[in-house]
Amino acid sequence: MVGMDLFKCVMMIMVLVVSCGEAVSGAKFDELYRSSWAMDHCVNEGEVTKLKLDNYSGAGFESRSKYLFGKVSIQIKLVEGDSAGTVTAFYMSSDGPNHNEFDFEFLGNTTGEPYIVQTNIYVNGVGNREQRLNLWFDPTTEFHTYSILWSKRSVVFMVDETPIRVQKNLEEKGIPFAKDQAMGVYSSIWNADDWATQGGLVKTDWSHAPFVASYKEFQIDACEIPTTTDLSKCNGDQKFWWDEPTVSELSLHQNHQLIWVRANHMIYDYCFDATRFPVTPLECQHHRHL
């Protein structure tokens, strides 16, 4: 009987793993992504893929599938040296004018000055929810991991698994939350010298082109959907690992990490910008330290 009980237990675990393992994880670039524009500026070197920006074009890539909830991660080494005027982005987005979007935007700077990481969130086409911070390392010398963890409870932006921003689901407070549109995963590099560096005061020096961002360790552990209109596979009663409270909510240690990031590296938070928002956005009233 003990042997039979053990067998049943193992089979139940296997069924659970299968039901929650419809995600896609760790793969080569071509398995998860494809060039979305300027194919000659997107170079797949096997383990590493590079996006190049010159005075002719930037470049970008996109995921082959769309997803509803899960975790996407990528390792990026940003443009070395003088990157002023350039923006490298890693983000998730749905389609259409009323789209949802989660953004990492890396704003280039002059040599010796720190990169600025800007995060932004769009829900139903409404954005303008920027936060900016300086990193606690040089992101141009080595690869670092940037992740977005998206569940029904929250959206968490992470750098090397350290949370830097959390957006909780506060629909019960009347605050919209991104939960009903499938998203693709994207990255791109482009010239944004009208605003990216010191408010547009520093322009791109094309004598330093090409500007190259490098990528590796492509991971998408998320619920892949068959069509953008059929979301039942991913938002029904079925439970995935990211639905567990121990995953979708920050631990005590992660909360301490987030507080440390905000205290030591945050340089802008839209919640405290009274010029842009004379009336404090509703979600800011409920995210005291987020």
Swiss-Prot record:
A Pfam cross-reference name: Glyco_hydro_16
PROSITE patterns: GH16_2
Site (Important for catalytic activity): residue numbering on this chain: 103
Subcellular localization, as worded in the UniProt entry: Secreted, Cell wall; Secreted, Extracellular space, Apoplast
Reaction equation(s) it catalyzes: breaks a beta-(1->4) bond in the backbone of a xyloglucan and transfers the xyloglucanyl segment on to O-4 of the non-reducing terminal glucose residue of an acceptor, which can be a xyloglucan or an oligosaccharide of xyloglucan
GO biological process: cell wall organization; plant-type secondary cell wall biogenesis; xyloglucan metabolic process
Binding site residues for xyloglucan: 105, 118-120, 128-130, 194-195, 199, 276
Function noted in UniProt: Catalyzes xyloglucan endohydrolysis (XEH) and/or endotransglycosylation (XET). Cleaves and religates xyloglucan polymers, an essential constituent of the primary cell wall, and thereby participates in cell wall construction of growing tissues. Involved in internodal cell elongation.
Protein name, entry field: Xyloglucan endotransglucosylase/hydrolase protein 9
Species: Arabidopsis thaliana
